């Protein structure tokens, strides 16, 4: 199964935290992993300078890029409402969009973000076993 790597997991890796999420990203660099444009945008926004931007682009290019389609926005809104209805409000709507793309792609998500923990509790999103909130 493809692993969709969220921005929070990339941050763990880039900071070399030594966490299980960090180590899993390192392991996935040579296997089947995916991102979407929203993850790419968030990671690239953190570039310190042009040189770092180039390094980040090279790193992200190792992942398959899954395009966001129009239906993903409706699905993201539905995921948000499902979580809210179950007593957990997702803090960042972009996480719902990323989750919608991962679900459509039949991929599990690797994350270090409480929003994805909530999404995986109340929707069909599957969290990678090494994920942490």
Model-derived regions: residue spans:
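Acidic, PIN/NYN-like endoribonuclease modules and their adjacent C-terminal/linker elements
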Residues: 1, 99, 103-133
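Short, well-structured N-terminal submotif of metal-dependent ribonuclease cores
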Residues: 1-35, 44-58
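A secondary-structure boundary/capping signal
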Residues: 6-7, 39, 112
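Phosphate- and divalent-cation-binding pockets in alpha/beta enzyme and binding domains
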Residues: 13, 42-43, 75, 118-119
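Structured helix-beta-strand junction loops
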Residues: 30-32, 62-63, 86, 105, ...
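General small-molecule cofactor/ligand-binding pocket signal
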Residues: 34, 66, 128
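Short, hinge-like loop/turn segments at secondary-structure boundaries
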Residues: 51-54, 83-84, 126-130
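Active-site neighborhoods of divalent-metal-dependent phosphate/nucleic-acid chemistry enzymes
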Residues: 65-112
């Amino acid at each position: 199964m493809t692993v969709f790597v969220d921005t929070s997991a990339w941050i763990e890796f880039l900071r070399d935290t030594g966490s299980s999420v960090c180590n899993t990203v390192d392991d996935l660099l040579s296997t089947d992993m995916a991102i979407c444009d929203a993850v790419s945008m968030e990671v690239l926004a953190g570039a310190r300078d042009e040189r770092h931007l180039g390094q980040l682009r090279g790193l992200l290019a190792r992942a398959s890029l899954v395009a966001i389609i129009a239906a993903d926005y409706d699905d993201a809104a539905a995921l948000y409402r499902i979580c809210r209805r179950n007593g957990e409000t997702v803090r960042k709507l972009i996480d719902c969009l990323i989750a919608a793309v991962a679900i459509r792609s039949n991929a599990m998500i690797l994350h270090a973000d409480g929003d994805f923990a909530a999404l995986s509790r109340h929707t069909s999103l599957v969290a990678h076993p090494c994920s942490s909130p």
